[in-house]
């Protein structure tokens, strides 16, 4: 019998100018199965050797920080979320750890509390809120105050172009400026405002236009992801709404009309043969827990 399983969707963040704020849950998943109690934590996985199999694993370490009193268990982890590709792999692990603690520790956390805790771990709400709530989220972190709004975007299709090369988030953040001129901040903020308004009003052409006009981060990250302009040009020609870096990169995130996503993905795959082209959907459920019996602390 499987006593407890947790499924967490991947996510993309920023959507162009919504830097560290806008996130979308995607149909790639991290699955965690909590098995029997053990003398110490054991994590069964088939990832690369650098991923810990003990209490240093991000899922376990997060769970133990959220609820230090939980007993060690054997857990099995599987995932089709690529690591260090800008698709929220670390955020999904953090969210999974919070939910494991929530279930084993009988914490009865609300969704808002999970977002608060996850944001404290991650440092920004976009990825974690999307993975917890599903759909499209717009979040703000101001000191200790976290505000998140969730909206539906069921008319959209998603394509992700995933390169073979990894790109560490710290490396991608290192190219960003430490200071931002006031006039540039005003311009960038205005574009981000219109992006969010267009998402809320389902004006998808405007969404696509705004997501390609970021000033906050993409101009500085182009040197790390030089194919972005050519992918953006082809995607638009094939009928996509817009293209942006997925999170910190190197994956590319494309929004399309839902009914055209397969056709556009096939066309892109013929052009960009060195990248994995994934036709995805927006995940609208967020974190899912299946519990067949109570196993407690």
Curated annotation (Swiss-Prot):
<keyword id="KW-0808">Transferase</keyword>
<keyword id="KW-0791">Threonine biosynthesis</keyword>
<dbReference type="InterPro" id="IPR000870">
    <property type="entry name" value="Homoserine_kinase"/>
</dbReference>
<dbReference type="InterPro" id="IPR006204">
    <property type="entry name" value="GHMP_kinase_N_dom"/>
</dbReference>
<comment type="similarity">
    <text>Belongs to the GHMP kinase family. Homoserine kinase subfamily.</text>
</comment>
<dbReference type="GO" id="GO:0004413">
    <property type="term" value="F:homoserine kinase activity"/>
</dbReference>
<keyword id="KW-0418">Kinase</keyword>
<keyword id="KW-0067">ATP-binding</keyword>
<dbReference type="InterPro" id="IPR036554">
    <property type="entry name" value="GHMP_kinase_C_sf"/>
</dbReference>
<dbReference type="InterPro" id="IPR006203">
    <property type="entry name" value="GHMP_knse_ATP-bd_CS"/>
</dbReference>
<dbReference type="Pfam" id="PF00288">
    <property type="entry name" value="GHMP_kinases_N"/>
</dbReference>
<comment type="pathway">
    <text>Amino-acid biosynthesis; L-threonine biosynthesis; L-threonine from L-aspartate: step 4/5.</text>
</comment>
<dbReference type="InterPro" id="IPR014721">
    <property type="entry name" value="Ribsml_uS5_D2-typ_fold_subgr"/>
</dbReference>
<dbReference type="InterPro" id="IPR020568">
    <property type="entry name" value="Ribosomal_Su5_D2-typ_SF"/>
</dbReference>
<dbReference type="InterPro" id="IPR013750">
    <property type="entry name" value="GHMP_kinase_C_dom"/>
</dbReference>
<comment type="function">
    <text>Catalyzes the ATP-dependent phosphorylation of L-homoserine to L-homoserine phosphate.</text>
</comment>
<keyword id="KW-0547">Nucleotide-binding</keyword>
<dbReference type="Pfam" id="PF08544">
    <property type="entry name" value="GHMP_kinases_C"/>
</dbReference>
<keyword id="KW-0028">Amino-acid biosynthesis</keyword>
<dbReference type="GO" id="GO:0005737">
    <property type="term" value="C:cytoplasm"/>
</dbReference>
<feature type="binding site">
    <location>
        <begin position="82"/>
        <end position="92"/>
    </location>
    <ligand>
        <name>ATP</name>
    </ligand>
</feature>
<protein>
    <recommendedName>
        <fullName>Homoserine kinase</fullName>
        <ecNumber>2.7.1.39</ecNumber>
    </recommendedName>
</protein>
<dbReference type="GO" id="GO:0009088">
    <property type="term" value="P:threonine biosynthetic process"/>
</dbReference>
<keyword id="KW-0963">Cytoplasm</keyword>
<dbReference type="GO" id="GO:0005524">
    <property type="term" value="F:ATP binding"/>
</dbReference>
């Amino acid at each position: 019998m499987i006593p407890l399983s947790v499924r967490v969707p991947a996510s993309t963040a920023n959507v162009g100018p919504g830097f560290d704020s806008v996130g979308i849950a995607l149909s790639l998943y991290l699955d965690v199965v909590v098995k029997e109690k053990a003398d110490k934590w054991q994590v069964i996985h088939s990832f690369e050797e650098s991923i810990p199999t003990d209490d240093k694993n991000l899922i376990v370490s997060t769970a133990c920080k959220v609820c230090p009193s939980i007993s060690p268990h054997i857990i099995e982890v599987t995932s089709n979320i690529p690591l260090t590709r800008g698709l929220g792999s670390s955020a999904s692990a953090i969210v999974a750890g919070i939910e494991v603690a929530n279930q084993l520790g009988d914490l009865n956390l609300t969704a808002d509390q999970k977002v608060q805790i996850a944001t404290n771990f991650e440092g920004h709400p976009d990825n974690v809120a999307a993975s917890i709530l599903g759909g499209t989220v717009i979040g703000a972190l101001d000191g200790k105050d976290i505000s998140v709004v969730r909206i539906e975007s069921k008319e959209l299709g998603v394509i992700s172009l995933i390169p073979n090369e990894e790109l560490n988030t710290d490396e991608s953040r290192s190219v960003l400026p430490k200071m931002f001129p006031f006039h540039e901040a005003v311009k960038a903020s205005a574009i981000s405002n219109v992006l969010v308004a267009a998402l809320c009003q389902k004006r998808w052409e405007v969404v696509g236009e705004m997501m390609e006009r970021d000033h906050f981060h993409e101009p500085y990250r182009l040197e790390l992801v030089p194919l972005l302009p050519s992918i953006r040009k082809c995607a638009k020609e094939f009928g996509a709404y817009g293209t942006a870096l997925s999170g910190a990169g190197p994956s590319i995130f494309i929004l399309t009309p839902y009914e055209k996503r397969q056709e556009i993905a096939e066309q892109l795959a013929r052009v960009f043969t060195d990248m994995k082209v994934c036709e995805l959907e927006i995940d609208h459920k967020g974190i899912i827990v299946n519990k067949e019996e109570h196993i407690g602390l």
